[in-house]
Amino acid sequence: PLLSNKESEFLGILSRNIIPDYSVFPKIRLIEFVRPHGSEEAVKELIREVQNITCDFVLKSYDETVLAVIQFGETATVRQQKKKLIIQRVCAMTEISFFEFKNTVDMMGSEDFCQFLRDDEE
């Protein structure tokens, strides 16, 4: 699926602000980055659940730090809300940093996000 104009703009701002330290992957399945370990049913269930969940943007730094960035407009559908919760859960289990922004202004104004990027550079 091609990116919408808003997403392309978001990607552009992400790229200008964090490249060359990170690779940015738009519209990518989280499972491609996340391989939850463990044989217990809960983990298997999680993998099944997350197989087809696409994160809006996944950033990956050279030292393999991964953060999932999800961008929804003001009104997220029920399905999007559920998707967000699943992504958050996967991130929590796999020590991926998760950020959610309504728009690029929101992102650039996020102290946590900027701090995360700065910490990662040190």
Which role does the model predict for each range below?
Residues 26-63:
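Active-site metal-binding core of divalent-cation-utilizing nuclease and nuclease-like domains
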Residues 1, 74-78, 104-105:
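Short histidine/acidic/glycine/proline-rich micro-motifs that form metal-
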Residues 23-29, 68-69, 97-100:
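Short, well-structured secondary-structure segments
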Residues 14, 55-59, 68-74, 91:
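Conserved catalytic cores of phosphodiester-cleaving nucleases, focusing on short active-site segments
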Residues 1-40:
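N-terminal topogenic membrane-targeting module
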Residues 62-64, 89-97:
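Arginine/glycine-rich "motif VI" loop of SF2 helicases in the C-terminal RecA-like domain
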Residues 50, 77-84, 109:
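Active-site-adjacent loop/helix micro-motif of nuclease/hydrolase catalytic cores
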Residues 95-122:
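Basic, glycine-rich
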